[in-house]
Amino acid sequence: MNSFFVFEPTGSTTLFSSLHLMWLWNTLFLCIWSGHMARRGHCAARAAALLLLLAEFFRVLTLFICGRLDTGFLPFHLCGAAVYVCLFHEARGGQLAGELIYSTLAPGALTALLFPDWLHYPAGSFLFLSSFGIHMLICAYAAAMLCCGLFHPSPQRLPLCSIILSLYGLAVYALDRLLRVNYLFLLFPAADSPLEWAAAVLPWHGLLYFPALSLVWSTLYFPPVLRLIQKGVPDPARLR
């Protein structure tokens, strides 16, 4: 408990250690449970969205009270934006918001869980716990959204998603240069991540985003995958 309010990188958790793997197993369990509850007609997506709202509010409040809230903790990373897109989707619905979550934001959250940049904080610290918790909830929301029957992935919406992501990336790059921050890891790669490995062989590590996103989309929109999703999702009319 003494390390809860430690904000300095003094942790020693390593990538894919037993502790890291435990969090990944917890994420898998939470996603399966959320999808199962949503398929049975329960409000799993709404619960995940409300927990995301509370977690983000508590994160900002804690950082503010501790005097640590600065330009480096604004919600401009992909997963920071995902919190608000999930909240918007739960409140207003919309297939485009759902498509962004399914195609990009949830895979981004999963990638962050696989290669977290917060492992250098103490394992019991606020930043360590809240970072895992928020990313897990984004994945859980996506699972519930997908299994409740109210959203159906469509590759026809990907061109518009690409435009939105490109504009967002350009805006964040300008913000990074202006505030001297590193949102979306555009200026330099996160430690112990594929971006850092790409920096050793590519002229700019950000070039990895393009083949990575192409691979993700090829998998998520592979026709057998879409048919499997469609087969496993209940008819929304039966849930009313």
Predicted regions and their residues:
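Membrane-interface transmembrane-helix boundary segments in multi-pass integral membrane proteins
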Residues: 5-26, 161-167, 179-218
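Structural signature of hydrophobic alpha-helical transmembrane segments
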Residues: 18-25, 67-79, 100-102
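Hydrophobic cores of alpha-helical transmembrane segments in multi-pass inner/ER membrane proteins
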Residues: 22-34, 80-91, 134-148, 206-224
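Membrane-interface helix-boundary motifs at transmembrane edges
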Residues: 35-46, 91-99, 148-158
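A glycine-rich, hydrophobic loop/mini-helix early in the fold
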Residues: 41-90
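Central hydrophobic cores of alpha-helical transmembrane segments
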Residues: 51, 100-109, 159-168
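Juxtamembrane "helix-exit" motif on the non-cytosolic side of transmembrane helices
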Residues: 59-66, 114-122
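A contiguous pocket-lining binding segment that forms or flanks enzyme active sites
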Residues: 116-165
